Amino acid sequence: MRSIRPLLAATGLVAALALTATACGPTEEEGADKPAATASGSTEKGGGIPADLADKLKKHGVDPDKWRDGEWKNWDKDKWLREAKDFVNPVIEGLWKPDRMKSAKDPAKTMSAGDISGDQGVTDPEPRPVTAEREKTPYHNYAAPVGKVFFDSPKGHMVCSGTVVKDPKNPGKSNLVWTAGHCVHAGSAGGWYRNIVFVPAYNDKGKSAAALRNAQPQEIAPYGAYWADWASTSGEWIKDGGPTGGEGAPYDYAVLHVKPEQGTKSLEETVGNALAVNFDAPEIARISAMGAWGYPAAPPYDGLIMHKCVDRPGRLSISPATPTMYRIGCSMTGGSSGGGWFSEGSDGKLALVSNTSIGPVTSGWLAGPHLGEGAEQIFTMMSDKYGAQ
């Protein structure tokens, strides 16, 4: 019989995340009179692509005007930028309208039992299923740092989850978002995804599809859509990531830097808080509970409602040559990918320690990477690069 200690810890963990929300969210009056912000980044007057991005596109043989007018839909291998240094994500004004967001699909990373037989020596028994619980609304009061990551892939409009994280070089004014590598890059078979945006507090009041049918844009994206002007993921994910995670799964993490709308506050100031990232979490046996938050989109879920799972973590090994991953019981499905996993540190404060990467075809559990030295290097690089922005 499982110990009741994780259940006690879980209660504290849920309360701790609720306490992180300090934002005074959009008021009813603001929602009625103001359209949702759509982060325009540093676009030139008239909606043009910034000169630096235009030059970068030209360097790769892409006409900036044609890109804006639909050339981004060309996924031919010679046009699909792949290397870490080649990320481009020009803002296309008005692209992510509410209906486009609602039509986005999950980039499912599912595995069969045979996919995880590489090293059973460090794989614990499969956890009991934990039914995901709906987050309380409004989300900006209970899980302010959590939101959705939208992007385009060769398969169409896609969606993941993400978390606003603290920026050590920009305290209190972070524009960094943590998500999964497979939410920004296709891995070994492809390149960078396109039109990547972060939408904090998506569907803030947790309304149903029917209730949102005639909703105003600010009901879908109360703080607008923040376009990523840079993304970074692990070299291992770019090299080894696959449709079911593969040997890239233990390195399936990414950091986005998003650009606030000109003249507005940082993302952290806007939503009211951000989570620290802990790259030195204790060994799994010493962690009594982890909580995963996200927006599951594959059946039986529809991607509109934020959910959470809390469980004592176990170990999952994909290969003897790769780091052991965390695994928890959770019924969340695709769409929750990239969502943060949180745990209390020795100081009693909540921190992000992983993100949703993979799960089985039948759901029932989720696995996420251990964030170690490699993840910290990527994060530090992003903080150093954008610390003053």
Regions picked out by a protein language model, each given a short descriptive name:
Residues 134-144, 150-153, 165-168, 185, ...:
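Conserved catalytic-core segment of clan PA serine endopeptidases
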Residues 154-157, 169-171, 182-186, 203-206, ...:
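Solvent-exposed loop/turn segments at secondary-structure junctions
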Residues 21-139, 244, 389:
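N-terminal low-complexity, Pro/Thr-rich disordered segments
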Residues 87-194, 198-201, 209:
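N-terminal carbohydrate-binding/catalytic regions of secreted carbohydrate-active enzymes
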Residues 1-28:
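Secretory targeting and sorting signals
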Residues 263, 362-389:
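C-terminal cap/linker of serine protease catalytic domains
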Residues 331-355:
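Catalytic nucleophile loop of clan PA
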Residues 249-326:
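Chymotrypsin/trypsin-fold serine protease catalytic domain
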